[in-house]
C-alpha cells in the first residue's frame, strides 16, 4: 500500500512536469471554450446540439490523451531504464501498476477538471453556460471515459517496447474504437443474418468503452429515444436507479481486467528478465 | 288523465315561478336523478342546476340549455356503463357541469349525436373517451377540462379526450386535456377548428385521420408522445402551435405529417422533441417560419416531394435533418445553426448549399439496430466520407446566414449559477493542485 502510494505520488510529480500534460490541457480547454462560444445561443441543457458536440469532442480528445499519457509513462520507464532500477527494489508489480494508474488518473482528471472548470465558469460569465445537470453528466462522462482508456493505456504500455510502438498501438486503438467503429460494425454485421445483428451489436458495445460511455451518457441526458425502438429496454434500464451503479460496476470490471492483463504480462516479462 | 293534467299544471306553475325568479326550472332535489329534471323540461327551456351532486346517466333528447348556478359546484356522477351524458337532440347547450365518470369502459363520458351542440366550461373526469362526437356537425367545445380518472391504466388502453367521428365544422377552443390517449382525435371530420387548447401527457395531442381543411392553431402540447399528428389529410393548417418535451418515447415527434397534402405548417415552435417536424409520404405542403430547436432531429423527411420548406429556424438540434427519398422539395432560405455558409454577394443567403446526408437514414431503415450509432463520432466521420449521388440529396439551396426570427427565448438561468460555481470550484482545485505539485518539485 505504501509502495503504491509512493509510485502514485512519483507518477504525479512526473506527470505535472510533463509538457505533454499541459499541451493536452490547453488543447482540451481551448476546444471546450470555442465550442461554447460557437453555440452561444441559449444555454446547454439535456441532449442538444451543443451537448452532442461536446460529447463528440470529448470522445475524440480524451481517449487519445489517456492512451498516450498512460502508455508513454509505462514505456518511458522501460526506455529510460527506470524500471530496471526499480526492479532492484522490493517493489511488487501490482503496487507499481496500480500506483501508476492512480497517479496518471490524478493527472488526467485534473486536466479534465481544468477544462470543465474553465468552460463552466466562462459559460456562466458569458451567460450561455450549461445547465447544472447536463454539466454534471458531461463531467461524469469525461471522467469515465478517461478512466476506461487509462486502463487500456496500461495494457498498451505493457505490450509496447518503446514509445513509438506505444504511439502506434494507441492511435490504432483510438481510431478503431472511436472513429472506425460504426464503419467496421456496419461492414461486418451487414453480412450477418438479420436476427444476429442486435445481440452482436450489444455484445460488441460492451467491449468498446467509448461506445458504452457515450450511450450511457446519451440516455442519461434524456436522449435515449434517439436509439430507436430496438433499445427501448436499455433506455428504461439505464434511467432506473440501478443504471449508474451497474455502469460503474462494468467500468470497474473493465479496468480491473485491463490492469490484470497488464499485470500478467508484466510479471511474465519480469520472470524472463 | 287528471293526473297528467295535474302534472302539466304543476310544471307550468313551476316554470312561471321560476321565470319570476329570473331563472327557470330549478332542480329541487339533490338526490334526484338529472334525467327526471331533463324529462320534465320543455324543449328549448333553460335548466339552471342548483349546487349539489346529481346522478347520471342522462340522455338529452330535446333541445335544452343546461347551466349551473354559480361556478364549479354542480357535479354529475355516473357509475353505469352508459355515457354520463348523451346529447341526442340538436341545439343543446351544456355548461359548467363537473362530470365524474371514473369507470373504465368503452362508452364515452359525454356522447354527442345532435348537431350544433355547445359544451362550455365542463370539467370531465373520464374512464373512457371524454367527449365523443358521432355523426353530428357544427358543435362547439370551449373552456373544458378533460382528465383521465382511473388509476393504473396503460396509455394504449385509455380513451381519447375528444373523439370525433364524422362530425364536420366543429370548433374546439381553449380546452385543457391531460393524461388521455389522444387529446383531440378527429376522423372523417372536415372543416374543424382546433384552437388554443392545451394537451399534456397524452399519446397524440391532436390527431387527424382522413380529414380535410382542419385548422389547428395556437395549441400547446408538452410531454405527449406526439404533439400534432396529421394523417391522410388535405389542406390542413397547423399554425402557431407550440409542442415541447416530446422526447421520451421512441416514436415521439413534435408535429407529424403522414400522407398529408396541400397543407400549411407555419409559425409553430417545436422544442425539445425527439423529432421536431416529421414528414412522410406527403406532398404539396408548405412548412414555413417554424422554430425548430433543441430536438434530437430537427426535421425528418421520408418519401416526400413537392413540399416547400422555407424560412424555418433550426437551432440547437443534435442532428439538423434526416432525409430519405425526398428529392423534389423546394428547400430554401432556412437557418441551420450547424451549417456554416459563405455569402459572397451579401444577400443574406449562403452561396453554397446545405445537403442532408441520407446515409444514416438508409442504413437504419434496412437495419434498425444501427440506430445506436446516432451522431456517434464514427458515424459523423463515415457520413463525411459518403458523398455519392450528392445531387440527389435533399438540399437547402440557399440557407440563411443569420436566423430569420428574433431570438425569443434564452434558456432559463436556473442551474446556470450552480454550474458557474462548480466550474470555479473545479478551477480552484486544479489550480491548487498544480501549485502544490510545482512547489513540491522545486
Q: What are these model-predicted stretches?
A:
Chain B
Residues 2-9:
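Bacterial N-terminal signal peptides that target proteins for export
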Residues 11-20:
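Bacterial N-terminal signal peptides
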Residues 25-56:
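Acidic Gly/Asp/Thr-rich repetitive segments characteristic of extracellular carbohydrate-active
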Residues 42, 61-63, 89-90, 94, ...:
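Parallel beta-helix/beta-solenoid
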Residues 55-67, 75-117, 128-136, 164:
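Extracellular beta-strand-rich solenoid/capping regions of secreted or surface-exposed proteins
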Residues 78-85, 103-111, 126-132, 154-166, ...:
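Extracellular beta-strand/beta-solenoid scaffold signature
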Residues 249-253, 294-302, 307-442:
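Functionally critical loop-and-helix segments that line ligand-binding/catalytic clefts
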Amino acid at each position: 500500500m505504501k509502495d503504491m502510494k509512493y509510485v502514485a505520488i512519483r507518477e504525479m510529480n512526473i506527470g505535472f512536469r510533463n509538457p505533454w500534460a499541459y499541451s493536452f490541457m490547453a488543447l482540451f480547454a481551448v476546444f471546450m471554450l470555442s465550442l461554447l462560444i460557437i453555440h452561444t445561443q441559449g444555454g446547454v441543457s439535456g441532449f442538444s446540439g451543443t451537448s452532442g458536440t461536446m460529447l463528440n469532442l470529448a470522445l475524440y480528445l480524451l481517449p487519445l490523451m489517456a492512451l498516450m499519457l498512460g502508455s508513454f509513462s509505462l514505456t518511458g520507464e522501460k526506455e529510460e531504464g527506470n524500471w530496471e532500477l526499480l526492479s532492484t527494489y522490493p517493489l511488487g508489480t501490482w503496487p507499481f501498476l496500480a500506483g501508476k494508474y492512480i497517479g496518471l488518473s490524478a493527472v488526467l482528471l485534473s486536466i479534465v477538471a481544468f477544462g470543465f472548470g474553465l468552460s463552466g465558469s466562462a459559460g456562466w460569465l458569458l451567460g450561455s453556460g450549461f445547465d447544472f445537470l447536463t454539466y454534471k453528466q458531461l463531467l461524469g462522462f469525461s471522467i469515465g471515459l478517461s478512466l476506461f482508456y487509462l486502463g487500456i493505456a496500461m495494457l498498451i504500455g505493457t505490450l509496447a517496447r518503446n514509445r513509438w510502438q506505444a504511439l502506434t498501438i494507441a492511435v490504432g486503438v483510438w481510431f478503431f474504437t472511436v472513429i472506425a467503429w460504426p464503419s467496421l460494425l456496419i461492414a461486418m454485421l451487414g453480412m450477418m443474418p438479420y436476427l444476429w445483428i442486435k445481440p452482436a451489436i450489444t455484445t460488441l458495445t460492451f467491449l468498446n468503452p467509448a461506445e458504452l460511455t457515450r450511450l450511457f451518457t446519451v440516455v442519461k441526458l434524456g436522449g435515449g429515444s434517439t436509439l430507436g425502438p430496438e433499445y427501448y429496454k436499455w433506455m428504461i434500464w439505464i434511467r432506473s436507479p440501478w443504471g449508474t451503479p451497474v455502469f460503474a460496476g462494468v467500468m470497474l470490471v473493465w479496468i480491473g481486467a485491463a490492469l490484470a492483463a497488464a499485470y500478467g504480462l508484466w510479471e511474465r516479462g519480469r520472470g524472463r528478465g | 288523465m287528471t293526473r297528467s293534467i295535474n302534472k302539466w299544471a304543476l310544471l307550468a306553475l313551476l316554470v312561471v315561478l321560476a321565470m319570476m325568479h329570473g331563472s327557470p326550472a330549478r332542480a329541487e332535489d339533490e338526490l334526484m336523478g338529472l334525467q327526471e329534471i331533463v324529462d320534465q323540461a320543455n324543449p328549448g327551456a333553460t335548466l339552471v342546476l342548483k349546487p349539489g351532486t346529481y346522478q347520471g346517466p342522462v340522455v338529452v333528447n330535446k333541445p335544452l340549455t343546461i347551466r349551473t348556478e354559480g361556478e364549479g359546484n354542480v357535479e354529475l356522477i355516473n357509475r353505469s356503463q352508459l355515457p354520463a351524458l348523451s346529447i341526442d337532440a340538436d341545439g343543446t347547450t351544456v355548461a359548467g357541469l363537473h362530470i365524474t365518470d371514473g369507470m373504465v369502459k368503452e362508452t364515452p363520458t359525454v356522447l354527442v349525436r345532435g348537431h350544433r351542440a355547445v359544451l362550455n366550461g365542463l370539467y370531465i373526469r373520464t374512464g373512457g373517451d371524454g367527449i365523443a362526437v358521432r355523426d353530428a356537425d357544427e358543435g362547439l367545445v370551449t373552456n373544458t377540462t378533460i382528465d383521465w380518472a382511473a388509476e393504473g391504466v396503460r396509455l394504449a388502453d385509455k380513451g381519447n379526450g375528444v373523439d370525433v367521428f364524422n362530425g364536420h365544422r366543429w370548433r374546439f377552443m381553449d380546452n385543457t386535456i391531460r393524461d388521455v390517449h389522444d387529446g383531440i382525435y378527429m376522423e372523417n371530420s372536415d372543416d374543424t377548428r382546433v384552437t388554443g387548447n392545451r394537451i399534456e401527457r397524452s399519446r397524440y395531442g391532436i390527431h387527424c385521420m382522413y380529414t380535410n381543411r382542419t385548422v389547428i392553431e395556437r395549441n400547446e402540447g408538452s410531454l405527449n408522445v406526439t404533439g400534432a399528428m396529421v394523417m391522410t389529410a388535405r389542406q390542413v393548417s397547423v399554425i402557431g402551435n407550440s409542442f415541447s418535451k416530446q422526447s421520451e418515447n421512441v416514436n415521439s415527434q413534435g408535429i407529424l405529417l403522414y400522407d398529408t397534402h396541400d397543407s400549411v405548417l407555419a409559425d409553430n415552435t417545436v422544442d425539445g422533441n425527439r423529432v421536431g417536424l416529421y414528414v412522410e409520404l406527403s406532398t404539396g405542403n408548405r412548412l414555413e417560419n417554424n422554430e425548430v430547436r433543441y430536438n434530437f432531429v430537427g426535421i425528418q423527411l421520408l418519401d416526400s416531394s413537392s413540399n416547400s420548406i422555407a424560412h424555418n429556424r433550426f437551432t440547437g438540434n443534435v442532428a439538423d435533418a434526416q432525409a430519405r427519398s425526398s428529392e423534389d422539395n423546394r428547400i430554401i432560405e432556412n437557418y441551420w445553426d450547424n451549417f456554416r455558409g459563405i455569402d459572397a454577394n451579401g444577400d443574406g443567403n449562403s452561396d453554397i448549399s446545405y445537403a442532408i446526408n441520407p446515409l444514416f437514414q438508409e442504413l437504419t431503415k434496412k437495419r434498425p439496430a444501427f440506430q445506436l450509432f446516432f451522431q456517434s463520432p464514427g458515424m459523423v466521420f463515415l457520413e463525411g466520407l459518403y458523398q455519392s449521388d450528392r445531387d440527389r440529396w435533399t438540399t437547402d439551396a440557399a440557407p440563411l446566414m443569420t436566423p430569420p426570427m428574433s431570438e425569443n427565448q434564452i434558456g432559463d438561468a436556473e442551474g446556470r449559477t450552480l454550474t458557474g460555481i462548480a466550474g470555479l470550484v473545479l478551477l480552484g482545485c486544479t489550480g491548487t493542485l498544480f501549485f502544490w505539485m510545482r512547489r513540491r518539485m522545486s
